[in-house]
């Protein structure tokens, strides 16, 4: 990896982390918050980011060349979104979050098998193991929720969906040699926005009312707009830079685990410094392990 690669990767760590900060600000300050409405807003502004970044060079005429990738990305995103929400409803949250984090293994393994990424060194494999341990420690808590077959299915949906989001993006860059990147993401995010809008509109029961109230509140409270706008732009930047790293032949075994480990470290740091949150011993240990894995992954 070159100095430029490391600079891009570091910028991705920060752009990925600030998305969580903006989300927290929104959910703390919104009178009637809706995760689906907020996600829809961020996706729309991520789409706008790609429109702006591609101004003057966008060409949708060869859409059939990248449409399969866009459909796969949107399907994976929708699968992950539905899986994560249903897993929360039907089983333990912490365990679901832990297994969900294992989705980073999918682009790592498929990157080696399908995309021709180099086999990670023993040190990087050790870094990946330490990262998984740190995620396990971070989510170590007793929960009363019972594990059911449905919960396992929904967790698997989340893992597979998240993993294939990352892999599909990398595959599009690799197999189409960096062409149609903006067009691919604009089409993908438009499809994702449609999926989220359908979830918000056609959801059943109390959730539908919460989403409707959340949407109206979001429109009325202009002070909340900035969080969705900034998070969406940061999301767009994150995706664009990840695609740049793939185009520069940085392997998935470095990109995804590094972003996960760095995100863990920066998120804990932000929680302590910005929100004065008290951290349990498990979180402190997880923070330290995340820092160690970050170093090992980039040796």
What residue ranges belong to the model's regions?
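Polytopic alpha-helical membrane proteins, predominantly small-molecule transporters/carriers
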Residues: 1-299
């Amino acid at each position: 990896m070159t100095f430029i690669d490391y600079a891009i990767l570091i910028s991705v760590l920060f752009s990925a982390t600030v998305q969580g900060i903006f989300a927290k600000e929104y959910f703390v300050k919104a009178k009637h918050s809706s995760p689906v409405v907020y996600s829809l807003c961020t996706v729309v502004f991520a789409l706008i980011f790609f429109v702006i970044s591609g101004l003057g060079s966008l060409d949708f005429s060869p859409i059939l060349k990248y449409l399969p990738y866009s459909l796969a990305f949107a399907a994976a995103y929708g699968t992950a979104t539905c899986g994560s929400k249903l897993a929360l409803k039907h089983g333990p949250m912490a365990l679901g979050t832990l297994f969900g984090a294992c989705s980073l293994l999918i682009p790592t393994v498929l990157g080696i098998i399908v995309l021709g990424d180099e086999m990670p060194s023993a040190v990087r494999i050790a870094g990946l193991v330490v990262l998984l341990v740190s995620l396990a420690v971070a989510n170590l808590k007793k929960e009363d929720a019972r594990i059911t077959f449905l919960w396992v299915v929904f967790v698997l949906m989340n893992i597979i969906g998240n993993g294939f989001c990352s892999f599909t993006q990398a595959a599009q860059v690799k197999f189409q040699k960096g062409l149609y990147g903006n067009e691919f993401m604009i089409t993908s995010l438009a499809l994702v926005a449609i999926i989220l809008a359908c979830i918000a509109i056609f959801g059943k029961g109390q959730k539908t009312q919460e989403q409707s109230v959340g949407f109206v509140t979001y429109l009325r409270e202009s002070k909340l707009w900035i969080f969705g706008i900034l998070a969406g732009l940061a999301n767009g930047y994150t995706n664009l830079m990840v695609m740049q790293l793939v185009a520069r032949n940085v392997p998935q075994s470095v990109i995804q685990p590094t972003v996960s480990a760095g995100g863990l470290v920066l998120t804990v740091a932000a929680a302590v410094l910005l929100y004065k949150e008290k951290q349990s011993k498990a979180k402190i240990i997880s923070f330290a392990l995340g820092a160690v894995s970050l170093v090992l992954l980039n040796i």
